[in-house]
Amino acid sequence: MGLNPPFDKEGIYIVDGKLHVIGPRYIAMVANALANETRARILRYIAKKPADLDELSHIVGQSKANISSQIRKLENVNIVKAKYVPGTRGIRKVVELNVNQIIFHIADPEKK
């Protein structure tokens, strides 16, 4: 039984707040982004509420530069999204979840 569009080819798709991951390359990319304790802690925290880099740095106990790098890896696979908002001292980068569920499609999308 094949998958319906947009799931008829490999890639990363967001549908109704769910991240659908299809194909070995993309599964490995998303799994790699999730396979880090710091990134897991960030995800658990922002699942409750969006947070800026200062807040995440304090919660996780790492530098803002490292947090920014970790966020970029999660952004690259569409798990989180960041926006820039005015703060009391300039612009703040606020991070929030982009999806509420991740689904790995193991079967070959071209099999019918």
Residue ranges and their predicted role:
Residues 32-38:
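Short helix-coil-helix linker/hinge
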Residues 40-44:
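Pre-recognition alpha-helix immediately N-terminal to the DNA-recognition helix
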Residues 78, 84:
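Glycine-centered, phosphate/nucleic-acid-interacting loop/turn motifs that mediate DNA/RNA or nucleotide
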